[in-house]
């Protein structure tokens, strides 16, 4: 169980309309606003669900997926604009939860005895990895007996045209890379060595457990009510699970991996920024710039005319070569300013005016 408690930090969120109502010279000045707000705390109870498959082995493999999602978006995180709608979260993360159940059924029928299996369905992931963070602080088995943690988060949107699967955490054990590459089968694997990331494997990595996170990529329906079951690639999910099974079978006979700390490429030298453009980047894109996989309605990008499939090449005076330079450019933007956004669209360079 995890009971969330409120902090003593006051938080204020301003809508674009609220910002527009402020004096134009307010930002950058030393003026102060007096605010009167009423705060109502809501306590919720969330539960992790665990199943232990005891094979009488000294070490245990953890397979995990988070089963929570956004509900009606009342706790934040939704990219939907308009009347509240239920967010079913088919890809994020019913796909991973279904994969967890399928693997539990599969291994229950096998005679694998090198290690035990612990199947974990986490809650509270969308609110900040709460379920997995709680588990590693209150584990039901010694963490030093864990072989590795495999995390399935958004495995339901494999593209048939590329069959590209993201595997994160490949730098957390010396043994990972040869296995990840050689066992790919029909899949094209895009690796990320970092053990950190915005999913539950991070909680285990921070406890010196080797991890792998399986991820088929972002899409326009991410954190929207349209993330529904009819948009999942079920044959693709099967390919992902078969790949995970091959990896499990290839684990060392003694059930020990050489854990390694990794460079946190996601957070290293990341600039702080106050603004958002309102795009969903294509994290599998390997070319110049930042490819747009989705555009959030009502945000600056959408209002400027940015389209899904565009590739961002420049923002104001900044050149955008990759995600790092994009974030640097975003950090250099100012509220209320209008700048030129350069995108590549269907082979041509298009200049748009975006206002923050």
Positions of predicted regions on the chain:
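Soluble metallo-hydrolase cores and metallopeptidase-like ectodomains found primarily
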Residues: 2-89, 102-105, 109-114, 137
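Metal-dependent peptidase/peptidase-like ectodomains
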Residues: 2-3, 9-27, 56-58, 112, ...
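Terminal peptide-recognition signature
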Residues: 63, 100, 119, 279, ...
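His/Asp/Glu-rich mid-to-C-terminal helical/loop segments that flank catalytic regions of hydrolases
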Residues: 98, 105, 109, 220-266
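Acidic/histidine-enriched alpha-helical segments
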Residues: 114-122, 149-152, 251-271
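PDZ/PDZ-like domain micro-motif
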Residues: 204, 296-310, 329
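Conserved PDZ fold ligand-binding element
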Residues: 303-323
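PDZ-domain C-terminal substructure recognizer with occasional recognition of PDZ-binding tails
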Residues: 313, 328-356
């Amino acid at each position: 169980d995890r009971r969330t408690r409120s902090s003593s930090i006051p938080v204020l969120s301003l809508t674009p309309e609220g910002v527009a109502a402020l004096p134009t010279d307010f930002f950058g000045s030393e003026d102060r606003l007096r605010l009167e707000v009423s705060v109502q705390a809501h306590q919720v109870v969330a539960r992790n669900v665990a199943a232990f498959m005891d094979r009488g082995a000294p070490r245990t493999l953890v397979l995990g997926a988070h089963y929570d999602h956004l509900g009606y978006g009342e706790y934040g995180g939704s990219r939907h604009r308009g009347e509240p709608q239920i967010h079913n979260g088919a890809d994020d993360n019913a796909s991973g939860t279904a994969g967890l159940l399928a693997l539990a059924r599969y291994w229950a029928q096998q005679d694998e005895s090198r290690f035990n299996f612990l199947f974990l369905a986490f809650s509270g992931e969308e609110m900040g990895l709460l379920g997995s963070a709680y588990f590693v602080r209150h584990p039901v088995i010694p963490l030093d007996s864990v072989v590795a943690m495999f995390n399935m988060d958004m495995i339901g949107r494999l593209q048939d045209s590329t069959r590209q699967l993201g595997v994160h955490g490949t730098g957390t054990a010396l043994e990972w890379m040869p296995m990840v590459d050689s066992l790919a089968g029909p899949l094209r694997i895009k690796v990320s060595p970092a053990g950190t990331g915005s999913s539950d494997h991070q909680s285990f990595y921070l406890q010196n457990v080797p991890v792998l996170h399986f991820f088929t990529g972002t899409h326009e329906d991410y954190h929207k009510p349209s993330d529904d079951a009819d948009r999942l690639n079920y044959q693709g999910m099967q390919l992902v699970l078969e790949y995970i099974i091959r990896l499990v079978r290839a684990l060392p006979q003694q059930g020990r991996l050489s854990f390694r700390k990794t460079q946190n490429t996601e957070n290293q030298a990341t600039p702080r920024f106050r603004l958002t453009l309102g795009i969903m980047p294509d994290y599998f894109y390997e070319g110049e710039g930042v490819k747009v996989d989705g555009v959030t309605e009502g945000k600056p990008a959408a209002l400027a005319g940015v389209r899904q499939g565009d590739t961002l090449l420049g923002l104001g005076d900044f050149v955008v070569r990759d995600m790092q330079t994009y974030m640097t450019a975003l950090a250099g933007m100012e509220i209320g300013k209008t700048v030129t956004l350069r995108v590549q669209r269907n082979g041509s360079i298009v200049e748009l005016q975006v206002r923050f």
